[in-house]
A protein has these predicted regions:
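Radical SAM/AdoMet-radical enzyme domain recognition
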Residues: 138-156, 165-284
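Conserved alpha-helical substructure of the radical SAM core
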Residues: 28, 32-56, 61-187, 191-197, ...
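Radical SAM enzyme core and accessory elements
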Residues: 1-79, 336-476
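A short acidic, helix-capping loop that chelates divalent metal ions and anchors anionic groups
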Residues: 121-123, 219-225, 290-293
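Glycine-rich, histidine-containing beta strand-loop boundary motifs that form or position
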Residues: 102-104, 114-117, 159, 187, ...
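Short alpha-helical segments and helix-capping/turn motifs at coil-helix boundaries
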Residues: 21-23, 83-84, 97, 196-197, ...
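Short, solvent-exposed loop/turn segments at secondary-structure junctions
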Residues: 43, 107, 218, 256-258, ...
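Radical SAM enzyme [4Fe-4S]-AdoMet core and its adjacent flexible, acidic
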Residues: 226, 232, 243-409
Length: 476
């Protein structure tokens, strides 16, 4: 009797990548890899790689914790996920990070932009004017986050390019007056490179502010393909200015398979040598926004492949150092390290997260301490700023026997690697998106998961028409 060439691991819901109708999807193991297999009644079967490491994929399933609920929900459950965003009461996680787009305008025209931003006055996609949002509109969006969160952990100002907004510092001052613990500025770094006085003024808002700096490559050809401009000197000048004022910075690297994935280790080494840099975030491209010519079979670069590249291209981390993030383990992986006396010490050189997240029999006694396990969950959370991560880590280390805690441990001693895998129509997984904790604030005040926003809810998105059809057909 013939047998299948795969193991059937589980079942979820996805969408057809062609018509975006909801379809059932199998999770299959085959030849050491994990696939999402689905069948649309109109467009037939399709299969996409979602992980190339079965062991790590299975490990992710154990890194879950009860979700934190927002104080209020924004929409009722009416049409089913992903057509009720949000947040609706069926969503399993609050907003670890809330993203506010303050402008449609940008001083670059990146080929991979998910937001369709650019320097032209009118969008070629929506045929609507690109504009800066007013201070009143932005305050409305900030207040929507605060209404959901009470005290928001992290708010990120994005765009477009937020630093070209004519009221940029008024926006920063407004945000800092609100109950928000940490503010991120998502930027391409051009203004930071060109205007030292701008950086000095930004530094006056320390602590509690961080630069989320685009940094994709050291190679001109890569930057030309991704960003349309050779930005090497811009990056160098920006980081020099940020170092001058020790302004907390995370490098964010957009990864394209076969283009800049060979630079992962070099970027980490560079980041470790910069006083202002607290970490690196790697984001593989997904089929969204302006991206053209994306082939899901050829170009898919899953989280597990990025994790492996970090391990292969650097000597800083071991496999057990890079672990799933409990609030959204399917999409996020993280490694913490200490920078002490010029040396980098991986966090798991001091503690082993597995021993705390998965309480095993016959293990050390202190792993049974629920408060200790909660402190580990708190540490491995996307809602941390470098300063709050330092505090959380110090509290954790103080609980552990025989672990010396540096007297001067502060946010300058923290270094974090993050892998963020966003979903698109090909690898969309309803089970996973329900745990999404990175949310974009819609102009009407709804907080919507990053993936569903770009797929269904962004003006001009591929799924906008599908969303309207579903809602009309099922209207009460």
């Amino acid at each position: 009797m013939p047998t299948r060439n795969h193991l059937f691991y589980g079942l979820t819901n996805s969408v057809c990548s062609q018509c975006l109708s909801k379809v059932e999807a199998k999770v299959l193991f085959r030849d050491g890899q994990v696939y999402l297999s689905k069948h649309c009644l109109i467009h037939g079967a399709e299969e996409v790689l979602i992980a190339d490491d079965i062991e790590y994929y299975q490990k992710m399933q154990g890194y879950i914790k009860p979700g934190d609920m927002p104080l209020t929900f924004n929409t009722p459950i009416r049409y089913g996920c992903p057509y009720d965003c949000g947040l609706c009461p069926d969503h399993e996680q609050h907003s670890c990070l809330s993203l506010i787009e303050v402008s449609d305008r940008c001083n670059l025209a990146c080929s991979i932009c998910y937001a369709d931003s650019g320097p032209d006055a009118v969008s070629a996609t929506t045929h609507t004017p690109r504009r800066h949002r007013s201070l009143e509109e932005i305050e409305f969006l900030i207040d929507a986050v605060v209404a959901n969160e009470g005290e928001a952990q992290v708010v990120q100002l994005s765009g477009g390019e937020p630093t070209i907004h004519p009221q940029f510092f008024e926006i920063v001052a407004l945000t800092k007056r609100k109950p928000i613990k940490h503010l991120m500025i998502n930027t391409n770094g051009i203004r930071i490179a060109q205007d030292l006085a701008f950086v000095e003024k930004l530094s006056q808002y320390k602590p509690g502010i961080e630069i989320y700096l685009q940094f994709d490559s050291f190679e001109a050809g890569v930057l030309m393909e991704l960003r349309g401009s050779d930005l090497r000197s811009v990056r160098e000048a920006a980081i020099a200015h940020l170092n001058q004022f020790n302004l907390s910075t995370t490098l964010v690297v957009t990864l394209k398979k076969g283009l800049n994935d060979h630079e992962i280790g070099k970027i980490i080494d560079y980041a470790l040598a910069q006083p202002c840099i607290r970490g690196v975030t790697f984001q593989p491209i997904q089929a969204a926004g302006r991206l053209e010519g994306y082939d899901a079979r050829r170009d898919r670069y899953p989280l597990t492949a990025v994790r492996r590249a970090i391990l292969e291209q650097t000597s800083h981390f071991k496999p057990e150092d890079i672990v799933p993030v409990p609030c959204h383990p399917d999409a996020l992986a993280m490694a913490y390290a200490l920078k002490v006396n010029g040396k980098m010490i991986p966090l798991t050189g001091l503690i082993n997260p597995d021993e705390f997240v998965n309480v095993m029999p016959n293990s050390v006694l202190y792993e049974q301490d629920e408060s200790l396990k909660q402190k580990l969950f708190d540490l491995f959370s996307t809602s941390h700023s470098p300063r709050s991560a330092a505090t959380s880590l110090k509290q954790l280390l103080c609980c552990l026997p025989l672990v010396p805690v540096p007297d001067t441990l502060d946010y300058e001693n923290i270094f974090r690697i993050m892998i963020v895998q966003f979903m698109d129509a090909y690898n969309f997984d309803v089970k996973s998106v329900k745990r999404s904790c990175i949310h974009i604030v819609h102009p009407d005040g709804r907080l919507i998961p990053f993936e569903t926003y770009n797929l269904f809810y962004r003006e001009g998105s591929a799924g906008q028409a599908k969303l309207k059809d579903v809602q009309q057909v099922n209207a009460p």
